């Protein structure tokens, strides 16, 4: 009767009545009712929300071996709701439910193995558990198993297998899988390269407000891949993703404003979007905002700020920023002139194929002694070993 009141089947939906009847059954030891009463307390439906009370009812059902309650109690331990956060206790309850072939618990236990929470990190065990849940149709497990195959974690890297699992999740309308399968089609990994199919999949996910898919669809519109080139559409999709905090979209929307593509050219607006991405550590945005700061395009010219931004991007290995920082040192712009440091940054960028850096390395070396060049080359090697950090 409680179930009918909760679902509104044969009676008007009434969570208070559902709670009343669940409680009567739960107090007689009915595990199904105990779990469902716990759900009402967790969601604040028909009762005042109370996570401790939810955990108490879940535990009573879980101790009777009820798999759904065991999984729900595990979730409470992971989140620290109604109980003290304790991953090992979560593992215990997930494992009991997973042993009863509960797909949610199999997936949740797999997550803990992937993160190394409450257990030793083990991608192979993650893959095994995801597979069990995925074969039962658990969409999150299907997508995440695809990710493991794409990245080669816990399984041999296999793009075709990744595509297979993404596709199963796509068939259930899962936006993350739609985006992930779209990426494989765009890159031609595990499937024949097909920009139109990539665009179709991105659009499905983008219309579900998936920020990564919105960005990726914008990218296709900007490049004219799988769709007619359309900067207005690119700007539209970049903006939707950027407003959700996608740093790549924020940077690319800034580029459109800087170039007046699909929007009215506005360097201040470009700087605004670059700055949002910079705050998230996006190297391309750091470089692009540095360019605006250096060139004074409707923003305050500040060579020191440009050098600071170039350095942030250079320390992330961005060749164009390494070249730009080298140029600043070579010309004493925003930093004290230093040909040894300039040569070092030119070296690093040139080794990545940056043609401007290659030319400047040759040019600046003409005014340097062999000892200075040797010092610069040693600094460049040490900088690479430190992953470009603290190179000055």
Give short role names for the model-derived ranges:
Residues 20, 35, 71, 107, ...:
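TPR/TPR-like alpha-solenoid signature
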